[in-house]
Amino acid sequence: MRMGITVGFEHRFAVRALAKLGPADEYIFLYAYTGRDEDSRSESTVRELIAAFGRGAGFRVDLTKPSEALEQIYGLGLERVVLAGGPRLLVLLALLASLLRRSEVYVLPEYSAEPLDLTPLTALCDLCRLSPAKLGIVASVSGRVGIDDVAQLVGRDSTTVARYLKDLSEAGIVKSLGGRRREYFVDPLLTTVARLMQNRAGSL
């Protein structure tokens, strides 16, 4: 696995990322170029990380050209991206590249020792292509629910809902949980995004 980690002036967040989310076959430390003197601090952090772990490579992201920077990050083919520090634009571009490539994506918050898994958001592009009926199902599912429960929530017959859930499951938007009574699960992040998309569509 090729893992990319955004890096700023401090190395502790990147160290936490490697401790919590490693190991990986290859580590790419993404650091920013802004044209300012402070850039040398990020470069120094990357060198310290590579020396400390004995592996990895630095990748300079030129934030003065955001469109090119996005394409460069996307082109790295990262399978997992950890947002562990660096300028806000670097973090934003790394997140966007992750969503477009459908990589695993985690954020290392300042207030918690545990990384947050944002990978469900990689289905965002798929949500934009859903029909209103299927989007309504994603927006309605909370926790583990059965087909009949979903049908009741959205006001449709169970046969139609079962077909929609099968399509959503194959697309990776809904998780199908096995058992005699099959149940379905949508990550709360996706449920919220789908509901907000519904609200926005209703206001146009």
Swiss-Prot record:
This is CRISPR locus-related putative DNA-binding protein Csa3. The lineage of its organism: Archaea, Thermoproteota, Thermoprotei, Thermoproteales, Thermoproteaceae. One of its GO terms (molecular function) is DNA binding. InterPro entries: Csa3 (IPR010163), WH-like_DNA-bd_sf (IPR036388), WH_DNA-bd_sf (IPR036390). Transmembrane segments: none annotated. CRISPR (clustered regularly interspaced short palindromic repeat) is an adaptive immune system that provides protection against mobile genetic elements (viruses, transposable elements and conjugative plasmids). CRISPR clusters contain spacers, sequences complementary to antecedent mobile elements, and target invading nucleic acids. CRISPR clusters are transcribed and processed into CRISPR RNA (crRNA). A putative DNA-binding protein it may regulate either or both of the Cas protein operons encoded on either side of it. It comes from Thermoproteus tenax (strain ATCC 35583 / DSM 2078 / JCM 9277 / NBRC 100435 / Kra 1). Keywords: Antiviral defense, DNA-binding. It comes from the Archaea. Induction: Not significantly induced by ultraviolet light or by NaCl. A monocistronic operon. NCBIfam families: cas_HTH (TIGR01884). The keyword Glycosyltransferase does not apply. One of its GO terms (biological process) is defense response to virus. Belongs to the CRISPR-associated Csa3 family.
